Swiss-Prot record:
<comment type="pathway">
    <text>Metabolic intermediate biosynthesis; (R)-mevalonate biosynthesis; (R)-mevalonate from acetyl-CoA: step 2/3.</text>
</comment>
<feature type="active site" description="Proton donor/acceptor">
    <location>
        <position position="80"/>
    </location>
</feature>
<dbReference type="GO" id="GO:0003985">
    <property type="term" value="F:acetyl-CoA C-acetyltransferase activity"/>
</dbReference>
<protein>
    <recommendedName>
        <fullName>Hydroxymethylglutaryl-CoA synthase</fullName>
        <ecNumber>2.3.3.10</ecNumber>
    </recommendedName>
</protein>
<feature type="binding site">
    <location>
        <position position="201"/>
    </location>
    <ligand>
        <name>(3S)-3-hydroxy-3-methylglutaryl-CoA</name>
    </ligand>
</feature>
<dbReference type="InterPro" id="IPR004656">
    <property type="entry name" value="HMG_CoA_Synthase"/>
</dbReference>
<feature type="binding site">
    <location>
        <position position="28"/>
    </location>
    <ligand>
        <name>(3S)-3-hydroxy-3-methylglutaryl-CoA</name>
    </ligand>
</feature>
<feature type="binding site">
    <location>
        <position position="296"/>
    </location>
    <ligand>
        <name>(3S)-3-hydroxy-3-methylglutaryl-CoA</name>
    </ligand>
</feature>
<dbReference type="InterPro" id="IPR013747">
    <property type="entry name" value="ACP_syn_III_C"/>
</dbReference>
<feature type="active site" description="Proton donor/acceptor">
    <location>
        <position position="234"/>
    </location>
</feature>
<dbReference type="GO" id="GO:0019287">
    <property type="term" value="P:isopentenyl diphosphate biosynthetic process, mevalonate pathway"/>
</dbReference>
<dbReference type="GO" id="GO:0004421">
    <property type="term" value="F:hydroxymethylglutaryl-CoA synthase activity"/>
</dbReference>
<feature type="binding site">
    <location>
        <position position="112"/>
    </location>
    <ligand>
        <name>(3S)-3-hydroxy-3-methylglutaryl-CoA</name>
    </ligand>
</feature>
<keyword id="KW-0414">Isoprene biosynthesis</keyword>
<keyword id="KW-0012">Acyltransferase</keyword>
<feature type="binding site">
    <location>
        <position position="266"/>
    </location>
    <ligand>
        <name>(3S)-3-hydroxy-3-methylglutaryl-CoA</name>
    </ligand>
</feature>
<dbReference type="Pfam" id="PF08541">
    <property type="entry name" value="ACP_syn_III_C"/>
</dbReference>
């Protein structure tokens, strides 16, 4: 089965603290931080969008992969915040990394799991022999209405993965998906912000699908939580992530490396891919990782990944997630609102 030849991440440098958002809306910042397990989140600059984030992440992935970009046969960008309604983000990324023109490209949408859907698509094309390498990106500049609970977590960032059959720094040993029609979160065409079902987004949506995919994978492979060195889950907030881990029998040491929501918020399509990248940054050869995404609507993709010796040669060829996160500067709510386009002139 195909594996990970290279991976890369990009997170905007701007940050806003939970306290600053709470100050504007008269909320209790300590209660929010405790309830969501979030302290601050990333904010895209005025010149950043899903396309620019995807390009930066892809370039970092190619640095680690050490391949010729012209050998990439497919580029998929998964997001729910593509900058154009009719104009693919994937072609922008492909052109920027010099993968064009002998390749296919497409934008994918499935709420927050579109990035892992792209990984699966690349795996299929690689394993079938149609392409040599595929590039899958999960990135977002997430939306949250002013004053809505989502505003405390909806952030920006993304990760890219070069998928191939040889010279892999990690092998994808198995994949498994769990999908139903569950309308927990949606945004119609023309709506500036999504709507969500509040508590309905928990048990019947996130937990049903994340746990369903993880348990389905374990049943399929005969593995249990004790058989994994690390686990990464979709992280709309830190609370859901840690609760899912406990329900599946994972210890905090297994899931802590991939938990990034407390310091960058929920990067939506980037959440699981970025968390996986942070885990690959610290994993030793031979480590086994369980990664489970989630997308509202709703579905989860699960992967079993085993790290190879090549990780030690390529890990330092691009910035680590920790290094990228450390590069930050804070903004107040006024600048945040300006950057996010929340202030609209008549």
């Amino acid at each position: 089965m195909a594996g990970i030849v290279g991976y890369g991440v990009y997170i905007p440098s701007y940050r806003i603290k939970v306290e600053e958002i709470a100050r504007v809306w008269g909320d209790d910042p300590q209660a929010i931080s405790r309830g969501l397990v979030v302290e601050e989140k990333s904010v895209p600059g005025p010149d950043e969008d899903t396309a620019t984030i995807s390009v930066e992440a892809a370039r970092n992935a190619l640095r680690r992969s050490q391949i010729d970009p012209s050998e990439i046969g497919a580029v998929y960008v998964g997001s729910e915040s593509h900058p154009y309604a009719v104009k693919p983000t994937a072609t922008i990324v492909a052109e920027a990394v010099e993968a064009t023109p002998e390749m296919t490209a497409a934008d994918l949408e499935f709420a927050c799991k579109a990035g892992t859907a792209g990984i699966q698509a690349c795996m299929g094309l690689v394993d079938s022999g149609i392409i040599k390498y595929g590039l899958a990106v999960g990135a977002d500049t997430a939306q949250g209405a002013p004053g809505d609970a989502l505003e405390y977590t909806a952030s920006a960032g993304g990760a890219a993965y070069v998928i191939g059959g040889k010279n892999c720094l990690a092998d994808i040993k198995e994949t498994y998906s769990f999908t139903t029609d569950t309308p927990d979160f949606y945004r119609r065409e023309g709506m500036p912000y999504p709507r969500h079902g509040g508590r309905f987004t928990g048990e019947p949506a996130y937990f049903k699908h994340v746990l369903g995919a993880a348990r389905g994978m374990m049943e399929k492979t005969g593995l249990s939580a004790d058989d994994f060195d690390y686990a990464v889950f979709h992280q709309p907030n830190g609370k859901f992530y840690l609760k899912a881990a406990r329900k599946l029998g994972f210890e905090s040491e297994q899931v802590k490396p991939g938990l990034l929501t407390p310091v960058i918020g929920n990067t939506y399509s980037g959440a699981t891919p970025v968390g996986l990248a942070a885990t690959l940054d610290v994993a030793e050869p031979g480590a086994r990782i369980l990664a489970v995404s989630y997308g509202s609507g709703a579905g989860s993709d699960a992967f079993i990944i085993e790290v190879n010796d090549l990780i030690e040669e390529r890990r330092d060829l691009a910035p680590s997630v920790a290094e990228i996160i450390k590069n930050k500067r804070y903004v107040d709510y006024a600048l945040y609102a300006k950057f996010k386009g929340k202030l609209r002139m008549a």
